[in-house]
């Protein structure tokens, strides 16, 4: 993974998995299998690929990039092969990587999966770091990691790169990974619910009601929600 010089704020760690309907998994370092899983979900894509960032003002910047599931920011490869974090992430409207569109929202970067008129079904992939966990949480005592001093970065990309923090990993630290479906309506993201689907597909209310009677849908799981969305779109 392109992380030999990666210096990312708030990272690292892992162990035994518990999968829920929300596709959420909890882990604690240093279990090897969990560490491998952490590495596999740290970014949205398995590698850094050429992409384009579109700012709110329409400005476009190109680079070799990926989206971090921890800080929900665009990371890119600098001229020294360092992994850097885009400085003005709050000004990014969207990014295109491998032909896929990722919309920057208050929840993070959501990938557009399906479209139906002005409504899109999207997916958020999120890795959450659980610092200062209460005693007993995940079956472990409270443990944290210390942060070293800021490292300055002079790399320029999309109006500059952010200073990065380097973690001194000297203890275990729990994290969880999840995939969450969202509706994107005219640029605004909403959690997927029966009420939301009824609202944005008013002519399909009867179909939605019947579909939900015949199918036990968990609205926090991407796969069944995607099937429902496609069925509503095609009906």
Task: Enumerate the predicted regions with their spans.
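Bacterial Sec-dependent N-terminal signal peptides
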Residues: 1-25, 228
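Short, extreme N-terminal leader segments that mark the start of a protein/domain
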Residues: 23-89
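Generic detector of short, locally flexible boundary/turn motifs and exposed helical patches
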Residues: 26-32, 38-43, 88-89, 146-150, ...
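Aromatic-patch recognition
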Residues: 61-189
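A short, solvent-exposed beta-edge/loop patch
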Residues: 165-227, 234
């Amino acid at each position: 993974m392109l992380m030999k010089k990666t210096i990312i704020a708030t990272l690292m760690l892992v162990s035994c998995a518990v999968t829920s309907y929300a596709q959420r998994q909890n882990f604690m370092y240093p279990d090897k299998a969990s560490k491998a899983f952490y590495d596999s979900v740290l970014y949205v894509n398995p590698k850094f690929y050429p992409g384009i960032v579109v700012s709110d003002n329409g400005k476009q910047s190109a680079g070799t990039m990926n989206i971090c599931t921890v800080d929900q920011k665009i990371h890119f490869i600098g001229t020294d092969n360092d992994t850097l974090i885009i400085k003005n992430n709050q000004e990014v409207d969207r990014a295109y990587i491998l032909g896929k569109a990722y919309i920057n929202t208050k929840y993070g970067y959501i990938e557009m999966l399906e479209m139906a008129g002005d409504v899109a079904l999207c997916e958020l992939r999120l890795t959450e770091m659980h610092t200062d966990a209460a005693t007993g949480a995940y079956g472990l005592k409270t443990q944290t990691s210390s942060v070293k001093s800021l490292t300055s970065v002079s790399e320029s990309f999309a109006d500059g790169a952010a200073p990065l923090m380097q973690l001194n990993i000297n203890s275990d630290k729990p994290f969880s990974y999840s995939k969450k479906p969202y509706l994107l309506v005219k640029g605004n993201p909403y959690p997927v619910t029966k009420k939301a689907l009824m609202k944005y597909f008013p002519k399909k209310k009867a179909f939605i009601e019947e579909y939900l009677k015949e199918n036990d849908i968990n609205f926090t799981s991407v796969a069944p929600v995607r099937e429902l969305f496609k069925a509503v779109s095609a009906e």
